[in-house]
A protein has these predicted regions:
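Conserved helicase/translocase motor-coupling segment
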Residues: 156, 286-291, 312, 316-477
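Signature of the SF2 helicase/ATPase Hel1-core->accessory helical subdomain module
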Residues: 235-323
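Accessory nucleic-acid engagement/destabilization modules that flank
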Residues: 1-93
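N-terminal pre-P-loop "Q-motif" helix
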Residues: 108-140
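Conserved lysine of the Walker
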Residues: 152
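C-terminal accessory regions
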Residues: 275, 448-541
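Hydrophobic anchor at the beta1->P-loop junction of P-loop NTPases
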Residues: 144
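Conserved RecA-like ASCE ATPase "motif II neighborhood" in helicase/translocase motors
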Residues: 202-269, 447-451
Length: 541
C-alpha cells in the first residue's frame, strides 16, 4: 500500500520482490505449489491497471475487483494459514532446488575451478562419512583441511549440491522432508556475494545452497526458531569462526556463545542426524575475533552433553584429545596439492616466508627463481601507471581473464595512491569479479581496488598489489606502526600477526602472477622495495 500517488520504479521492484522470494524460498509457493502474486495499491493513482509477472498495480477503488480476479479455488488447492506459517515452510521450492543443482553440474563457475581429479578422494570420503552418520543416527564434526588453492571451497559446494542427500533426509515438523538438506555457509561476505552472483542464473538469487554465516546464526539462535532444515551444515574457513566476544558484539546478544557452540547447538536440534563439515585453511585469520582457531570447535564439542564423533586430518588430533574428545584421523580429508595456481607450486611457501618474522632472503630468492622457471611471474614496480599498462596489454586478447587491484585495509596512505571514489553500493563485489571489461565495475578496469577482506577465498588470473605503509621493512624487521589503528574495543590480540596474515592473503590471489607496486613517492617503502628485489622479484620493465 502506497499513499503518495506516485510510481517510483523501486516501489514496483520491492513489491515484485516479495512475490519472487516467496516463489523461490517458500516450499508451498513455488512452481509445484500455490502461485503468489503481489498487488501494489497506490492512493491517488489514476492510470489503468498494469499487470506483469508477479505484480499487478492498481488504485484503491479497483482493489476489490482485482482480489476477486485472483480468487480461483478451482485452479489450486487453497493453502491454510497454519501451513503457510509452519516452522519449516521457509525453504527453497523443490523446482528451484532442481534448477540450481542442474545449473551447478552443467555450468563452470569462473571463480571456483572444477578440480575433480584432485578432490575426488576427499569428496568420496566425506560422502561415506555422511552415509555412516545417517545410518547410525549420530552427530558428527567432519574437518576438511587443505593448503591455499587446494579446492576446499569446491568440495564444500559439491557436497551442498549432492542429490543423494534427499534420500537420507528425515521428516520435519510438517511431516515433509527438507527440500535442500545441505547448505554451504561462509563468514566471508565477498565470497558469498560472488558465488550467489554466479549461481543466480538458475534463479533464487543464488541463495539456495549458499548463505552467510552471520544471518544463519542470527536466524536459528532465536528462541522461537525451529531447527535448521539441513542435515549437512558446511562451514567454510571454520578456523576463522567468531569467538563468543565477537558474536556478542556483532549480534548485540550478551549471552551468546561462540559460532562453533552455535553450530553444535543447531546440529543437535536437527531431527535424526546431522553432520557439520568444517573447511579448514591456515594463516588466514584476518578479522578480529577469529584468532581462536580450531580450538574453539574442540571446546564446543567437549562442553556438549550429546555424544559427538569427530573425524579429520591427523594434524588436529592433539587439539581434540587435549579436551578429551574422541578423534578419528584420516589423511583423505586433507588436500595437500594446490590447484589454484597451475604455474605456482611454491607460491604459498614464498608468501609465508616473505611475511614471516625472520625471512630467509636467500631461500626466498631460490623459490622465486623456481616459480619463474614454471612460468609464474613475481614482478615489482614503483610506477602504478606502468603496471596497469602492462596488464592491459598482456590480457588484451583474453577477455575472460581476470586481473585487478588489491590493497591492504589498514593502509592509511592508499588515498594518496589511487582515488577510491564514492562509497560503494551494496552488491558490487559480484560484478567486480565476474563482469566484462566494458562494465564500469569490472576488475579489469583497474579503477577500484579490493582489500584482503574482499580477496580472501577468491582468485584472479593476475593481481596488481599496491603495497601499503601499514606493513613495511624497518631496519630489517616488519613494522606496522603506521597502520590504521583498530578501535579500542575491537579486542585485537596481535595486530602485527593480522597484518602478516592479510598480506599473505593479498600475495597469493593470482593464478599466473602478481605485480607488487610500491609507489616511488612513498620513501618509507624504499627498504621494503629492496627486500622484495633481494627475495627474487623481477623489476617490471
Amino acid at each position: 500500500m502506497k499513499g503518495d500517488g506516485n510510481w517510483q520504479p523501486e516501489y514496483r521492484e520491492q513489491a515484485a520482490d516479495y512475490a519472487r522470494r516467496l516463489y523461490w524460498f517458500h516450499r508451498y509457493c513455488g512452481e509445484d505449489g500455490v502461485r503468489v502474486h503481489t498487488v501494489l495499491v497506490n492512493y491517488g493513482y489514476g492510470e489503468s491497471d498494469d499487470e506483469r509477472d508477479f505484480l499487478t498495480t492498481t488504485r484503491v477503488e479497483k482493489l476489490a475487483e482485482v482480489i476477486e480476479r485472483f480468487d480461483q479455488p478451482e485452479a489450486a488447492q487453497p493453502l491454510s494459514l497454519e501451513r503457510f506459517l509452519s516452522v519449516d515452510a521457509c525453504q527453497p521450492s523443490p523446482s528451484l532446488v532442481r534448477a540450481v543443482r542442474s545449473y551447478f553440474s552443467e555450468h563452470a563457475l569462473p571463480r571456483i575451478k572444477r578440480i575433480d581429479q584432485v578432490t575426488q578422494k576427499t569428496v568420496a570420503r566425506v560422502i561415506t562419512e555422511i552415509r555412516e552418520t545417517h545410518a547410525t543416527r549420530k552427530r558428527k564434526l567432519l574437518l576438511v583441511s587443505g593448503v591455499p588453492g587446494a579446492g576446499k571451497t569446491y568440495v564444500g559446494l559439491q557436497i551442498a549440491h549432492e542429490r543423494f542427500l534427499d534420500d537420507l533426509a528425515e521428516m520435519g515438523e510438517s511431516d515433509e522432508k527438507p527440500t535442500a538438506p545441505a547448505v554451504f555457509l561462509s563468514g566471508n561476505g565477498p565470497l558469498v556475494e560472488v558465488l550467489q552472483y554466479e549461481l543466480k542464473g538458475a534463479g533464487g538469487e543464488g541463495r539456495v545452497f549458499v548463505r552467510g554465516v552471520k544471518d544463519f546464526v542470527e536466524k536459528y539462535s532465536k528462541k522461537r526458531s525451529g531447527p535448521p532444515p539441513h542435515h549437512v551444515l558446511i562451514f567454510d574457513e571454520a578456523q576463522r569462526a567468531w569467538d563468543a566476544e565477537r558474536v556478542r558484539l556483532k549480534h548485540d546478544d550478551p549471552t551468546a556463545g561462540s559460532e562453533p557452540e552455535a553450530f553444535v547447538s543447531f546440529a543437535e536440534r536437527v531431527p535424526g542426524w546431522c553432520v557439520v563439515i568444517g573447511l579448514i585453511g591456515g594463516g588466514q585469520e584476518i578479522h578480529v575475533g577469529e584468532e581462536g582457531g580450531i580450538g574453539m570447535w574442540a571446546d564446543a564439542i567437549a562442553s556438549s552433553e550429546t555424544a559427538w564423533e569427530v573425524t579429520g586430518p591427523k594434524q588436529f588430533e592433539s587439539v581434540f584429545e587435549a579436551k578429551c574428545v574422541a578423534f578419528t584421523a584420516s589423511d583423505d580429508l586433507h588436500l595437500s596439492e594446490s590447484v589454484r595456481f597451475h604455474f605456482a607450486a611454491g607460491l604459498s611457501e614464498w608468501a609465508t616466508g616473505i611475511v614471516s618474522e625472520k625471512p630467509d632472503v636467500s631461500k626466498l630468492a631460490t623459490i622465486a627463481k623456481e616459480l619463474a622457471i614454471k612460468g609464474y611471474q613475481l614482478r615489482i614496480t614503483r610506477a602504478l601507471r606502468e603496471a596497469k599498462a602492462f596488464l592491459w596489454k598482456k590480457y588484451a586478447d583474453l577477455p575472460d581473464a581476470r586481473f585487478g587491484l588489491l590493497h591492504s585495509s589498514r593502509d592509511k596512505r592508499i588515498g594518496d595512491v589511487i582515488d577510491l571514489g564514492p562509497r560503494r553500493r551494496f552488491g558490487w563485489i559480484g560484478p567486480w569479479y565476474a563482469d566484462p571489461e566494458d562494465s564500469p565495475g569490472s576488475c579489469r578496469r583497474l579503477a577500484q581496488p579490493i582489500s584482503e577482506f574482499e580477496a580472501q577465498g577468491l582468485e584472479l588470473d593476475h593481481t596488481l598489489l599496491i603495497w601499503g605503509t601499514d606493513f613495511v621493512r624497518t631496519e630489517g624487521f616488519w613494522d606496522d606502526s603506521s597502520a590504521r589503528s583498530y578501535r579500542s574495543k575491537s579486542g585485537v590480540r596481535d595486530p602485527l600477526q593480522l597484518r602478516r596474515n592479510a598480506y599473505r592473503v593479498l600475495l597469493t590471489r593470482g593464478r599466473e602472477g602478481v605485480i607488487i607496486c610500491l609507489p616511488k613517492f612513498l620513501t618509507e617503502l624504499d627498504e621494503t622495495f629492496d627486500f622484495f628485489v633481494a627475495s627474487g622479484c623481477e623489476v617490471l620493465n
